Amino acid sequence: MEPVYFLPMKSPFLSRIDTGAETSSVDADHVVSFERDGEKWVAFNLVNRETGEKHRFEKKIKRQPTVKRINGSEERVVVMMDVRMGEEIVKAEFSLAARDRFNYQGLIGRNILTGRFVVDTSLANALR
């Protein structure tokens, strides 16, 4: 678990580090797709469960992969997000997911970890 700041938000989202996940994801709600200048965009809210801080984002859709699940498959929306982990600011792909049933609102995958961070499973909050 590590604190991750979804910029420009001021409070961190506790996020699970998952070296098995290719793409990072974040708990988003009120997700609405729309078109702007002939391109696909999405508007969504991020709400920090710990602090109640809320921010409405509008992002261009980077891709929409189909994710296979046990009970079928679902299409996910992937956008580029600016995040801060420790002292490092990273622009990376995040899939927008309903993570309300999970303990952590964010999941940090290999797309952020590779070449930037070393994972030590014996530690938590190592970036603080």
Model-found features: residue ranges?
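Pepsin/retropepsin-fold aspartyl endopeptidases
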Residues: 1-128
